[in-house]
């Protein structure tokens, strides 16, 4: 009883110090949790950018295609750029805080070599509402896009290629691990688990150095995505890609994602290729860097997934 009384009405110096430290720790934890929660909200609700094009005058004869995403995720609008009849279809999966409109030059480079190309916006990007799960549910959007295109009579339903950057790379790789229609992959700055992208988001907000901030943000993100708590890291199913050519692109100016990409490459089965670039994020490259990047991506697909036509339905 004396101990409880002393804790309630501290009179000794060490008891007062203990109570002060306890209060400090409590408020520090409370502040960290609150800030982490706010950061996660900003991460899953990124600032959206939307691009529109004049379909009648834009080069490449684009066509608007709409498709439903299962699980109540709503309708997506995509732009389809036709290539050679029966040639493979390349789906471009944009990165976090990006949009389909920022990939039009990469699209043109692929279409110029007779590939069919399709681009769309993920949830919480472009004109789409919702929140981003950093890959958990975005893979369903990629699957819905593949299903839509595979049903077209002018396309080969068995030959698809995927290109993706960070968020898009995660969704593309997750889809390829379970879909034999995916015949080639280009993965730029891919991560193994979405919580790794949360860490990147915290660090980009300048709070990565605060004690326990990354951990608190990760826990908040996992709580929001509790339904996916059993989803394994991508690296656990990489053997499903045996025989699927994959190009891993590391960007040295993004050390965190460069390291995760390197680790994924080391664990990946053959055939695999690695490209190490000084700068990443295609949409932020200068014109010369974009041309070099486009040439690398197009060359990979030309060798690994030739743009030859096949008999279609």
Q: What is each stretch, according to the model?
A:
Residues 13-69, 77-79:
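An N-terminal hydrophobic leader/cap segment in hydrolases
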Residues 69, 77-79, 224-311:
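Serine-hydrolase catalytic core
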Residues 87-95:
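Short beta-strand element of the alpha/beta-hydrolase
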Residues 96-109, 131, 260:
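The serine-hydrolase catalytic nucleophile loop
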Residues 107-129:
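Conserved alpha/beta-hydrolase
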Residues 133-153:
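Alpha/beta-hydrolase active-site loop
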Residues 154-166:
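Alpha/beta-hydrolase fold nucleophile elbow
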Residues 177-227, 239-244, 259:
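Hydrolase active-site cap/lid region
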């Amino acid at each position: 009883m004396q101990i409880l009384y002393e804790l309630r009405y501290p009179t000794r110096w060490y008891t007062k110090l203990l109570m002060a430290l306890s209060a400090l720790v409590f408020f520090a934890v409370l502040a960290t949790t609150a800030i982490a929660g706010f950061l996660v909200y900003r991460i899953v609700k990124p600032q959206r950018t939307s691009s529109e094009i004049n379909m009648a005058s834009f080069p490449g004869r684009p066509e608007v295609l709409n498709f439903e995403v299962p699980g109540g995720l709503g309708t997506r609008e995509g732009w389809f750029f036709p290539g050679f009849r029966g040639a493979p279809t390349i789906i471009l999966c944009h990165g976090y805080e990006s949009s389909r409109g920022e990939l039009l030059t990469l699209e043109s480079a692929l279409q110029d070599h007779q590939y069919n190309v399709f681009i769309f916006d993920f949830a919480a990007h472009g004109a789409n509402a919702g929140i981003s799960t950093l890959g958990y549910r975005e893979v369903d959007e990629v699957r819905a896009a593949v299903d839509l295109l595979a049903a077209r009579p002018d396309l080969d339903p068995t030959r698809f290629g995927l290109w993706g950057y960070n968020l898009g790379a995660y969704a593309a790789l997750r889809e390829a691990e379970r879909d034999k229609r995916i015949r080639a992959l280009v993965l730029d700055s891919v991560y193994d688990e979405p919580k790794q992208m949360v860490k990147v988001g915290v660090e980009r907000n300048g709070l990565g150095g605060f004690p326990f901030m990354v951990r608190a943000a990760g826990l908040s993100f996992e709580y929001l995505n509790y339904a996916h708590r059993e989803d394994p890291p991508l690296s656990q199913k990489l053997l499903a890609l045996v025989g699927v050519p994959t190009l891993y692109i590391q960007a040295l100016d993004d050390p965190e994602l460069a390291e995760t990409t390197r680790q994924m490459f080391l664990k990946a089965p053959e055939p695999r290729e690695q490209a190490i670039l000084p700068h990443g994020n295609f949409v932020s490259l200068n014109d010369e860097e974009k041309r070099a990047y486009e040439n690398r991506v197009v060359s990979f697909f030309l060798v690994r997934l030739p743009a030859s036509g096949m008999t279609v339905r």
